[in-house]
């Protein structure tokens, strides 16, 4: 038995650092119309303002992606997986059935292989599928006028109790570039957006552990975190750890991009322990099944992979259906030809067979599979630019136009769909991408990798890309795929995952502020108030990364007394602008009267000066 196998057999607990509650925070649940709709949020408890400005500060509620991992009342056992949230809702709709056997040949082969027992997730669930090839997608329900429990859950979650603060805290006016963001998100608004294809709810019926979330430009900007093994490294336990770590810091969805060993088993462990939607690129595993030879790929093997992953519970598939034979020659004169793994695989297949890809020709067959499990399309940008010199070229935009055509086909089948975008794009060319996507794809949600705005900073591409991510998020991009410092350099570790997610949480939040998303500024204002009042602990705790903020402060002022001091090590006690401003704010009425009297006299002298032709010296004889 390998060391990895031994570890898996005993893998029940999560690293304590991954699940400890955030400081001064409570996990709260807001109940919906029935008891089984319990929407999680994080409540940040604030200290009172003291001194002459004394007042109580209400707690701040923030969107929480960490699932039950940060709930001290829930015992986590990775071997058993998470509890089901949506099973009852799915059963009550009475349009699915539990299968008597797995539908995928590959799944059955893996299950029958006794040598894999040491790697297998122990508590495998029996998958569901729509009855009689019915449609069980959230889009189908939305078009029927049905508000599902998932939609109600999302409405509560998106509002995040911000209405409690609306009379207390102001917000700058935003520019939403034609988005339609209401003051209050209602269940009906969620239904309407999904029915029109402007938003998606990735929620496979075989992933009932998910806490429902939504992706669309009229909702908060979301971020995705990538994990996954490679042929050169990582293990099942490391990938599960990365998933838990990623959602702690704010990943709204996770993509498992595994290309190494035991992809099937790795994915099962991740899905069963994930409270957020899981996405994959099915062509990666399909390629593994044909021993890495792209020319040997077939529709039959790909179809079996789709069914295998749908029955495991994958919530969205990246499908590179827009890589058409006619677009491949357009990439020849690029500096960096085709950088998408999936795109390059399909381009090679198209050239080898000199025909359109089986993904493109069988697209409606794929829709038939997706709708029976409610798997969402993430239509992949296989021809995205890999450097800023290649941005916005004919290959990229030709593929985007095809994705728009495929979106309409998916919608005809009531299959939820969003669109993937670049890539590497300089700042002045980003808005063109967003505008063209909205036009070509009928306002289907856009999901971009950055984009990276410059190519000169290996090791810092979480920054080069977060700049572009904030910008395109402002213009209307619905979800941002994070980039880590290891981009272009290697497989990210846990610290890289955190760095990438924090950079993208900043970008997404900055975009929400710029759009004028209701309630987006509450946290900023609360932190600013804490900063002005020298409530250091509140400053740390309101931040996206309290641990790092506290660490940086304590490097120069480590003593507990420094947590109440009215200065930091940057300015010291004599030059703190906020301390001086506080003193100005506490000037008494008598002093203010003196200042006003002086101003009146100054105004008189000014008028007298102007009356005398604005001359510094009096003219002779005057």
Swiss-Prot record:
Substrate binds at residues 226, 255, 284, 320, 340-342, 381-384, 420, 447. [4Fe-4S] cluster binds at residues 568, 571, 576. GO terms for molecular function: 4 iron, 4 sulfur cluster binding; carbon-carbon lyase activity; zinc ion binding. Its cofactor is [4Fe-4S] cluster. InterPro entries: ThiC, ThiC-associated_dom, ThiC/Bza_core_dom, ThiC/BzaA/B. Belongs to the ThiC family. Its EC number is 4.1.99.17. This is Phosphomethylpyrimidine synthase. Catalyzes the synthesis of the hydroxymethylpyrimidine phosphate (HMP-P) moiety of thiamine from aminoimidazole ribotide (AIR) in a radical S-adenosyl-L-methionine (SAM)-dependent reaction. It is an enzyme of class 4 (lyase). Pfam families: ThiC-associated (PF13667), ThiC_Rad_SAM (PF01964). It catalyses: 5-amino-1-(5-phospho-beta-D-ribosyl)imidazole + S-adenosyl-L-methionine = 4-amino-2-methyl-5-(phosphooxymethyl)pyrimidine + CO + 5'-deoxyadenosine + formate + L-methionine + 3 H(+). HAMAP family: ThiC.
């Amino acid at each position: 038995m390998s060391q990895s196998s031994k570890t898996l057999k005993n893998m029940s607990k999560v690293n304590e650092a991954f699940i400890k509650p955030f400081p001064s925070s409570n996990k709260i649940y807001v109940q919906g119309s029935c008891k089984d709709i319990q929407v999680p949020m994080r409540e940040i408890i604030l200290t009172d303002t003291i001194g002459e400005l004394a007042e109580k500060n209400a707690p701040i509620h923030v969107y929480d992606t960490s699932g039950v991992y940060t709930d001290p009342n829930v015992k986590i056992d990775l071997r058993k997986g998470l509890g089901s949230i949506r099973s009852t809702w799915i059963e009550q709709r009475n349009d699915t059935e539990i299968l008597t056997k797995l539908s995928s040949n590959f799944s059955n082969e893996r299950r029958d292989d006794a040598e894999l027992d040491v790697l297998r997730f122990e508590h495998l669930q029996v998958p569901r599928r729509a009855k009689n090839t019915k449609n069980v997608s959230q889009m189908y329900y939305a078009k029927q006028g049905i508000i599902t429990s998932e939609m109600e859950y999302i409405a509560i979650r998106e509002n995040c109790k911000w209405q409690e603060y609306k009379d207390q805290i102001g917000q700058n006016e935003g520019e939403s570039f034609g988005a339609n963001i209401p003051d209050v998100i209602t269940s009906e608004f969620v239904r309407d957006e999904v029915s029109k294809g402007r938003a998606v709810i990735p929620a496979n019926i075989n992933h009932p552990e998910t806490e429902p979330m939504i992706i669309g430009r009229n909702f908060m900007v979301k971020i995705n975190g990538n994990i996954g093994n490679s042929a050169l490294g990582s293990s099942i336990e490391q990938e599960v750890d990365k998933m838990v770590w990623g959602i702690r810091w704010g990943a709204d969805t996770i993509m498992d991009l595994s290309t190494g060993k035991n992809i099937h088993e790795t994915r099962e462990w991740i899905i069963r322990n994930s409270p957020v939607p899981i996405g994959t690129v099915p062509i990666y595993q399909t390629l593994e099944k044909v021993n890495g030879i792209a020319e040997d790929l077939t529709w039959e093997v790909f179809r079996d992979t789709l069914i295998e992953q749908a029955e495991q519970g994958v919530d969205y598939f990246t499908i590179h259906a827009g890589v058409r034979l006619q677009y491949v020659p357009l990439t020849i004169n690029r500096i960096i030809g085709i950088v998408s793994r999936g795109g390059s695989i399909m381009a090679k297949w198209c050239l080898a067979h000199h025909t359109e890809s089986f993904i493109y020709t069988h697209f409606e067959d794929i829709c038939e599979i997706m709708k029976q499990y409610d798997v969402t399309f993430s239509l992949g940008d296989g021809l995205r630019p890999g450097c800023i010199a290649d941005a916005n070229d004919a290959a990229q935009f030709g593929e985007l136009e095809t994705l728009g055509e495929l979106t309409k086909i998916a919608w005809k089948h009531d299959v939820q769909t969003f669109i993937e975008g670049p890539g590497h794009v300089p700042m002045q060319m980003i808005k063109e991408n967003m505008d063209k996507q909205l036009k070509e794809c009928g306002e289907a949600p856009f999901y971009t990798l950055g984009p990276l705005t410059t190519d000169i900073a290996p090791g810092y591409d979480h920054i080069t890309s977060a700049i572009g991510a904030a910008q395109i998020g402002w213009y209307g991009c619905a979800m941002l795929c994070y980039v880590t410092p290891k981009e272009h350099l290697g497989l990210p570790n846990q610290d890289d995952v955190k760095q990438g997610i924090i950079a993208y949480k900043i970008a997404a939040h900055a975009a929400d502020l710029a759009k004028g998303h209701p309630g987006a500024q509450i946290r900023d204002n609360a932190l600013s108030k804490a900063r002005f009042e020298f409530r250091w602990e509140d400053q740390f705790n309101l931040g996206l990364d309290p641990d790092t903020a506290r660490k940086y402060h304590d490097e120069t002022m480590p003593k507990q007394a420094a947590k109440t001091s009215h200065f930091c090590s940057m300015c010291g006690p004599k030059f703190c602008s906020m301390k001086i401003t506080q003193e100005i704010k506490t000037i008494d009425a008598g002093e203010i009267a003196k200042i006003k009297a002086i101003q009146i006299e100054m105004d008189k002298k000014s008028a007298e000066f102007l009356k005398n032709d604005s001359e510094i010296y009096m003219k002779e004889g005057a």
